């Protein structure tokens, strides 16, 4: 099976891209520019990146970086162009190379390229007769167009691990999503969930794609929608079976029926995951996002365990929150991020880090980052570190002291257990639930109340007027190797 993941080759070598599949990278056009310079190009076919790696008069050893190693992120006049204005070539020189493109979120290579200099051309591509050509006039060069000369940048193996990667190079970009599409079909790396979420947080929403996902100015948009607006008034007191359910069929993940104080979740939102395409262990994830505004909304910018090695309940296998900000104005100046290893406080939030903002965090876009290392975590926002978690001798003892029964499972792993396995990325939006908001004045439900969800719904006249800018907007997601 083709694994739909992205392996970018920014200043690296040896990081293996994905092969197989029907798409063929077009042949690269190489040109020796008179009196000096090299130009390499391919026609644009909807790519999001073009990379060129080559060596002069020396064969490539597999997927090494080469003397030339350059990623191009923008096409010009219908072509993706690599330019080295300082390359001094002569007739008979031979360039060995490979190219790499990203198309629809997938990476493709053209391997074993060879090209020999048989002629020189002007900047406009016309052939130059070097025996009669006048001294050239150097064109004006913008700083953006300048390219460094050949450099050797060998691959140093990273501690980062990724699905379908035999080798990951230090500092390499191993996943990238810019949300430049216009529909979910354009997101090859993501799968949308369609299900009723349950334990351990029991939020008051269901996940679907019906009206809850969109795209705006290059950003993914996840918005809350009233369930009754999709179905009919009173559906929350009825029964709802989800078509195309991605949860476990025949369970409460796919079917809900109102009974007593329990109702069908009154709000629909969305959640997207890379579970089927990309997961990694150790690295740095950057998410540029604008948080939602509105009472009792919770953004989900998370890393979730791929295999639940240490258990699949009560966060026994861990959850890493890259960032979250509660949507209520009274809470929105405080940013949180970090690990969760239990469903209940005090240990649930004990290791979370926070940062007080001068203004509400949901006023604008920010870059939220989590650095995941073999011995701890760091939380950052806009490049500034606001929290560190040192694993020390492991999390078992502190969890045991806080009566976390599943902590003994972590003794099977390393000091980072349960965060020593692969995790995948999730982006979504949650509503209320029983753990993220403490009971108190102004909160229309009690977390342990038997009628919590219906009390939340019956008080919609209090919270719904605050839902003006409720969308979670994500500009990009990037994962870098250590």
UniProtKB/Swiss-Prot annotation:
GO cellular component, one term: extracellular region
Induction notes from the record: By bacterial and yeast infection.
Lineage of origin: Eukaryota, Metazoa, Ecdysozoa, Arthropoda, Hexapoda
Quaternary context: Monomer.
Protein's recorded name: Beta-1,3-glucan-binding protein 2
Molecular function terms from GO: carbohydrate binding; hydrolase activity, hydrolyzing O-glycosyl compounds; pattern recognition receptor activity
UniProt PTM comment: N-glycosylated.
InterPro entries: BGBP_N (IPR031756), BGBP_N_sf (IPR043030), ConA-like_dom_sf (IPR013320), GH16 (IPR000757), GH16_GRP_C (IPR035806), Glycosyl_Hydrlase_16 (IPR050546)
PANTHER family, alphabetized: GLYCOSYL HYDROLASE-RELATED (PTHR10963), GRAM-NEGATIVE BACTERIA-BINDING PROTEIN 1-RELATED (PTHR10963:SF60)
Tissue: Cuticle and fat body.
Record carries keyword Transferase: no
Glycosylation sites noted in the Swiss-Prot or TrEMBL record: 124, 189
BP terms from Gene Ontology: carbohydrate metabolic process; cell surface pattern recognition receptor signaling pathway; innate immune response; regulation of innate immune response
Physiological role: Involved in the recognition of invading microorganisms. Binds specifically to beta-1,3-glucan and lipoteichoic acid and causes aggregation of invading microorganisms. Binding to beta-1,3-glucan activates the phenoloxidase cascade.
Region: Disordered, residue numbers: 127-153
